[in-house]
């Protein structure tokens, strides 16, 4: 695709996941039946950290969306509803599904769907694609945090430390308190088995000097997708 010279319209949007409001930003070029791109931010982050991707995707013809996960940002950076203690990778999959449904309901979007995610958002995007393999045309993963299940089993997730055999109700993780549901959702997960139902196009980008998510997780994912 070539960069479009047409103006990009930017607007805020909201949609619902149960009784929680998800808030985000749409970047829309001119046209009809536009392909959709959903971009997911990482742990403790917010939509601001991935807006550069949505902007570029809109310039090459996508109707692109970024949003704040419910409870997925360091307070008060996130604009969506929800407590950080109620957030998990699986609730973020549900958020992604809600944004996809919203985007697909609009009169100017088509059937083509690209999912993109960074770090934890990469794992969320991969799990979402695995749940909807026929709906997702392309999957782009930047340093996807497939380490999260292993970290939960080891009892350390970023700044959080806990006994994996006796999960506490509340977990201290620097400026972002987590709930028991965060490790509980993934502690028994075989993530590389979970992602393999998706057989479409996948691009994985991962720096070899990453000290948080080791690049061998990206290599394992590439092998799982092969």
Label each PLM-derived region with a short phrase.
Residues 43-55:
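The serine-hydrolase catalytic nucleophile loop
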Residues 49, 85-106:
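Alpha/beta-hydrolase active-site loop
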Residues 1-31:
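N-terminal cap/lid segment of alpha/beta-hydrolase-fold proteins
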Residues 211-217:
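Conserved alpha/beta-hydrolase "acid-adjacent" motif
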Residues 198, 204-206, 210:
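Short beta-strand/loop motif that positions the catalytic acidic residue
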Residues 107-118:
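Alpha/beta-hydrolase fold nucleophile elbow
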Residues 131-178:
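Hydrolase active-site cap/lid region
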Residues 54-79:
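Conserved alpha/beta-hydrolase
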